[in-house]
Each structure stands twice: as C-alpha cells, then as structure tokens.
C-alpha cells in the first residue's frame, strides 16, 4: 500500500505570535506560528477592520520560538527562528513579486530534535537588534552578535557561550539598556544539590535566581553580571523600557524586568530596591472551608510604548487582563501599579498594534482581534500600588490578597475573529445532506471548557446574503451597468426573461424604470457600458447602442438570421449569427460602433463566444474564443493586421455550452504577470481550463474538473477587487486567486442559474444572482477558506460523540475536570446560605464562555450527555450527570434482549483522578432512544471497578474496555450482565473496533491487538495477534478486514496489516482451540501484524475516518489533529503514479524547501522511518520554485513543467479538495 498525504485544512492553533514591520512599509504585520510548523503573516485591513492573511508557508519542521529584530539603519524587521533542526534561522519576508519568506542564514548550534540541553526553547533579542540569546531548558545558552557583511546581508557571529551546569531555565528575556552593552535576564534554578540529596530536603530549600548576562561588545565576551534569589514560583519575565532617548536626555524607562510569580509581580533591576504588588484575583463564591487557596500566575504579557510613556498588559490563567504601569523619575522607580483591565480568552501571545488594536492568540479555539476603546484611565477601577505596602511590597511572606469583580468588555471592542478548530477532540466524516451535497461534511468536537463548540465543516466558501427578493418570473440572465465609465457604483440591474427584459434602477431603493432606451419586449443576450457614456444591449434581432437619452443607434440582424451568442467589453462587441458566422464591432474614436466589413465563417454553429476585458493602456483585447457544436473551440485574432484570422483550434470531448476568457494571476504558471485562461464548460458537466499564449494565441496546459451534473455556465466577476470566474452547475463554483495561487471552490449557497458583479453603496463589492424566481444580492466575506464552519456552543469540553444509525442525530459526551457541576453549585450555595454566609451569585451568572467557571479542587468533575441536530446546528436535549461523575466513552449497541432497538450506553467514572489514574467507581449508563433518536430515557446503570474508556456494540452484546480488561455485556432488567472478559491487556483498553466476529483493541501504550469472540464451548475473547512495536494509541479505524490505520500520541499515523493466511486460519477455527494453544512470540500474541505504512504528521491525531471525499472518488483516510488540522491519506491507483510522486518528492527534498533547515526525511520520520507515504504538501511546493528549478526537475521526470503541475492538481482534485 502506498499513500499520498494531503493537508485539507492547515493547523489553526497559534503557539507564538510577534508583531513587526516585516514588509518594510510603515504598517505593521502579525507573524504567527500555527501548529508549530507553519509561518503565517496577518495584516490589518484598515477598511474592514479585519485581519487578512498575506502569506502562509509550511516550514517542514517544528518551530520552537520566533522573534523579530531590526538592525540600526534598516527599514524593516527580520525574523529569528529556532526549531528542531538545531539551527538558528534568519528569515526575511519579501512582498514582491509575490509574498514569501526567504531564509537568509542558518547557523547550526546543536543536534536536531527538541531536546532539553539543545538551545532553541528560549529566544531573546536585544531591543536594539544587536544580538540574541538562544537558550535551552537546561544548562546551554548561546549569544550571537547580529551583523551585516560587505554586501549588506545579515549573518550571526560565532556563538559565545554562557552555559551553567546543573541549571534549569524557566524564562529568558532581553533587558532594555538603550545603547549600552546588550543585557539578558534569565530565571534559573540550580539543581546540583537536589540531585544528590535523596531525602528531598535540598529540593525544598532550592532557590530560583534572577540572573543577568551581559554581552561586552568590545571584548566579544559574555559575563554573568548579577544574580539574586527571587520567588521560586516565578514563571515569566517581561522587558521594561530603559536607556536614554536618542533625541534628548530623557530616560525611556527604568529598565530591568517584571518578574511574574504566583500571586505577585515584582520589578527588579541590578542593585536597586525591588517593587512588589499582588495580582488581583476574582472572588470564588464556591470556595469551602478547608479548601486550599489556589495560586494565580501570569501566562502572557505584552508591553506597549506610547508617546512619552509605556504600559503593560498582563494576562492571568483565568483570562483576566491587568494594566501595569511604572511611575518613575528617570531611572528611579517611584511606584509599580496594577489594575483590572478586561477579560479575554487565555492567550499564548498578545500583540498590540500601533493603530490601537490588540491581537489575542488564544490558547484554544478562535483567535480574536480587539480595538482599544480606552486605556482604563480614570475609569474608577481600583488600583494597587507598591507604595501601599511596607518597603514597597518587599516583605517576607505573601502580600494580602487583592480582589476585583470581573466586568464585560469596557476598554476593548471585539472587531474580528479568526476561526480556529483547535483542539479537535473527536470528528466524524459523513454526508448527512443526502442528494443535496456531493461531498461529505466533517463534524468536529472542538475547544476546551466553556468555549467549546461543535462544528460542521463543509467544503466551500461562505456566502453572506444581503437581499433576497421574489421576481414576477424566472429570469435567465442578470447584469449590472454603470451609466458612465467613471461612475463609482452601478446604476442599473438588467434582468432577461424568455419573453422580455426588465431594467431596475439602483438607488436608496431598487425599483423598475422604463425610460432607459433598452428594448423590453424581448430577451437580452448581453449588456455593456461602452466607451465613456454609452450603453449597449444585444438581443436576438440586433444591437442597440444607447448614446444619450434621445439617441439610440440600432444594428439589425440580417433578414432571416438571429443572434445566438454575444460577448462584449467596453470597446469591442462580437456576435454569432444563426448562420454560423461572426460579426465583429469595435468602438471608434467618435464613440460609435464600427462593424468590421467581413464576416467570419465558422466550421459549425456557434454555441458560445467570449472576449477578455481590454487590458489597461490598450485599445482592444487581442483574442476571441468561439465554441462550436462540432465539439471544437477556436482562438481568433482581433488585431488590426489579422482580424478574424483563426490562430488555434482545440478539439473537445463534448459540445461546449459556455466559454470565458479571463486574465487571472497564478504564480504556478507565471510569477510576474497575470495569465490568460480560457475556461470552457462542457455539456457533460466538466470544466476545462487552458492557458492562452499572449503572443500567438496557442492553447496549452489543459486541465479539467468535474463540476456537477448540469452543463456549467461561465461568467467573469470581480470578487474583493480581483478578477474571478464563476461557474454555475449543480453547485456554484468560484475560480479566484488567493495568495497568488489559483483556487477553485464551490459556494455554500443555494444553486444559482446566473450571477454578476454588483457595486452599490450598500454593497461595494457584492454579487447579484438569480435562483429560480428569486433575486439574490450577496458577497463572499473571506476568500481562501476551504471549509466553511458552522458552530454550536457546548457547555464543557467535548470528549467523544457518535451518530444515530439511521437519523441525523449526534450524541456527545462532555466533561471538565476541576469544575463544579450544576448540582454541586446548587448544593454549595444552599449550604452556605443555610450557614448564614453571603454568596455572590452575580459571579456565577457571568457568561462562562467569556469568563470561565470557578475552579474546583482536583477530583471534581462536571459532565453531561448532549443530543445534537447537526443539520440545524442546535441542541435537542442535555442530560447532566451526577455530581463528580464524568463521561469518558459512548456507544450505540443492539442487544439480543432489546427487541431490535438501539440503546445508548455511556461509560462514566466517579471522583476520577488523573495522577494517579483512577476513580472511586465506574458506571455503564444505559439509555433508551426515543422519538427517532431525539429523546433519551435513562434505564439503569451498571457499576464497574475502573473507568470504561471505550465501548462498542457487538453481535447483540456490548464490548467495554474497562481498565486492562475487555468485557462482554448482555442486557439485563436492572443492570448489564457480564458474560465474559479478557484481562490480558498490558495497560488500558482505549479503543475498540469491530468487523464481524473480529475485534481490534487499542491499548493505551502497547498498540493494537486482534481478538476474536468464540461462544463454543464457552464464551471467550481470545487475542491471536498484536503489534511488535509499542504505541501510545489515540485512534484506530479499520481499512479492510486485515488492515487498520492508527494514530498515536507522538503525531504518527501508521498502517498495520495482518497476514491474510493467518486471518483465514483464525476464521476457520470455530472453537478457538488453536489460538489457545499457540506459542507466544516476543512475549505477546502468537502472530504479529506488519507495518506497511508510517508517517509523522507533527501533531496528535484524534480521529481517522475512511470515506470518499468527492463524487465518484475513491476511499481516503481523513484524519484530524489536536492542533486543528484536517488531512487525508489518498491511496495510489497505479505504479506509475507511485513512481512519479516518489521521484518528485525525492527531488523536492534537495531544494532546501524547509525555512528552518530541517531535513525532510528526518522530520517525517521523527520516531520511525517513513514507509509507504509520500508527502503531498512537499510535492505541491513544486509550484513555488523558481522556473529554472522547475524545468530541471521536470526534465529529470521526462515531463514538462505544465505536466507536473497538472498531475499534482489531478492527484488532489480526484480524491480530495
């Protein structure tokens, strides 16, 4: 088996984000690391207030940290990146000719991989961009001086060591000293004594130190300048501005760092008295007597400079933002102050833009962009100052707690949301829309805690509808018109009906007008705004050129002939007559249409004609394309010296029904200018796209795609200011450019018969379309998104969900640890009120999706079972479980004693602890399914001795993985009845898959086991095969009777297959006697599976589904990851494809595609060498190579560059999207 790995949707979680002017302009961009492997740059769109993606590039390596820097005299920021390649990479973002990243230098500093003593975990940059420090978790610290050579190129110097043995590093940051020698601060813990002390006493006395390292630029040497003990719970350092202003003697700030510890924030600098303040916290209304107070830490921070001042925004682990500022007199700190600012989702990074926005890169779920409404000055919110405490807060022991009441957003305004799927905890791929959709939908359980969502992912672009209005009939075409060439907005909407034409005026309202000069008694074939102030109408019997209100020039069709097709632009008109002739018109300098004297005879009757828009600076477009009923398309010249000469001819496989010439930018074909594409819609529903040579009109690089059962209609459109093509078949498709690559995607919208661009005051960048007898005005808010997302809010973290066997209903289990359930909250509130204690219920009533929930001690759980309607995106019902009972598994089972009806079984644990793993008791809850799956009725529950981590229905019984045991249960009147079990599994049973009488069991740490059930002479569950390698299994799916695809906790997908002869031998043993007496092999089962495929995805795989993704396509393995990515493993169908893609992959590995210098084979084979899988993402980056390199690779493959690109597109579109 050979597979091709394709990414369908990139990872969405942001591990790190920095802000800078990476493009060199005055505007700022946000650089994000998505999924640890992808570099992405956002830019704020000043018009819409939204974030637009400028470039997104796969690094083919795990990026550990990034930072921006700028050397003196430079006009743009550069990027430093550390990764698992063991190299320090200097990257540049280049905006032209197409936005992309360039790797300027890669300095090797250690072994590959993410190791604790290899630098890369921490990256700190001198604020003046002169040097950087790269640190590891333990011991190693390297300092590089950043220089420019004689050619002006950046490069790092040889590394200067600042190692310290037996030292653990918590955080490193650059200290702002102005133009003094670069200084770095580190939080370090010396464990040398603890390592030698077996009593643990040395560990209890271990201190954490704040250490300053100075780079002496004169001596080119690093010294350990200052070190002082600090709070051992310190976890984060924040840079404080310092140094003198370049234009005055004023100090920018006091320098030093903010040390963020548990419950406190401390300002520290060398040999200066520190200032300490408490971190304000929320009151917990549910805290009980005897509960230990939970500490509060800062998890992210950002510093922002404004004119003559600066402030910090620090975020706690609850999501609360605090404004911190320092009152100082030169270099002397007067006071350190803090106040509550607002509450936003917990973030990995915070980025403040100069335009007054803050980007919150959330740890989980959607990332948000907020606009500052105020800086919380004089808002009445309580402030806490270091001067409020003795010795500026530097007293032994903790400071008194400071409390605040969280409030809805007051200083920030949410303006944009970047959808994010991470983490995907479970997913199913299934087509619940039936015949109305030719592709399945991806249903995913996403998020954590109160921000969790259930999401429906559909392939296509989202559409925002603005107007939907019924019409008196069913129109065939729709157009919009400007009155003059210089008009900003369209003035008319023209609708063509089979027996007439309707003209609507666009103003404050849309209303019918009659005095336009258009012929309204018959259908219209085309309309156009001609020249400066002319309008054109083409109808079956002639042309009407409306030059003024009282002047209409008409051109009648020859007697006995009609116009069957027409195409126009603002200076040219071509019509096709029913006598297989073409007539060409061109606008003369006086503004009149001049007919070319000769008619062009065609080889067959014309079915469609098209010309492109007039290029800027020219008087005409050069080519005309004509489709004829003899299954040919001709390219005809419109140049003065060769007018109506046929330049090229292409035979087709079916008659063309629509044709469209459009100039669209596609960097895979031409990296410098737009490409002229000829798009042809055929009678059989296929879209052909071919490239027209701009010199001789020859056709090349033809590609095809099946769009639907209906013959496509094609039309040019402007979408978000760029030329595009719309295709109307059984679905509506859009061909457009995104990140300089041509994309073809369907619209998630009602089927349209026709559409046109619309520019109006209410909709400057819209589209107008017709669907039946309804007029629709809509726009496409965001291009580039392959999957449209519809979400339903959940209460707790989703764990697993399953679908009803026959109805479109999902059953989901949710559970959160350290969270009070609803019954627990009611109990505690009643108990406190009975004791006469005040309970602030206002805090409990705050929206949990914005403020979270009060934290409970370990062992407390909140959980529920939810019934979902995925088509309506709504919750049908919710069943809350008992206090501290959490659901971990769910299945639908048919029981022999159940009357043939399905039952829902939920596995739960009570008082579950995670470390060590265990529970007070477990239960199997059984629910009857009523009213077509929409109602659940509790029947009974069965006690177990461990947590049921997985369940599955099996031949009228229930299989349950409970701890190390696999058990078989039968339905009873008051409980489930255990019939047999196998407790020979090593650690814990986490997955169960059933095929006939065969059971594939996934163990938590020891991979998969093949089992069979035998009822003669007694009921038995027998293991007959297992894996030879230990694997930490996360998900398993059956590929065929002998083969399984599995994912593990280290980001690997692997395919295991059982020898068919062994499989047949086991099936022929009705009693299992042979299995029982076979000799164990390698301390396991008698037989071993063979690994036939292995590939490292780079993120934990949470689900795998076998299903075809496109109409008529073959089955693929669709997987999801915890970082929010969706991908597919596509099987090859021929040995030629395997050889071609494998050879192309081999060539691409030699092209230094990785921005961080990671070896591709080592990356994709991180734990086990790659086997049987080709990296499709790497192969598709062939289109990004310079043309000479593309030619060299294509020559080795005995193909042209166009053939290689065509094959890559075909491999994706034939099985995925």
Swiss-Prot record:
It comes from the Eukaryota. Transmembrane segments: none annotated. It is found in: Nucleus. Its main location: nucleus. GO terms for cellular component: nucleus; spliceosomal complex; U2 snRNP. InterPro entries: Beta-prop_RSE1/DDB1/CPSF1_1st, Cleavage/polyA-sp_fac_asu_C, RSE1/DDB1/CFT1/CPSF1, WD40/YVTN_repeat-like_dom_sf, WD40_repeat_dom_sf. The keyword Chloroplast does not apply. Keywords: mRNA processing, mRNA splicing, Nucleus, Spliceosome. GO terms for molecular function: U2 snRNA binding. It holds the Pfam family Beta-prop_RSE1_2nd. One of its GO terms (biological process) is mRNA splicing, via spliceosome. Involved in pre-mRNA splicing and cell cycle control. Belongs to the RSE1 family. Associated with the spliceosome. This is Pre-mRNA-splicing factor RSE1. The gene is RSE1.
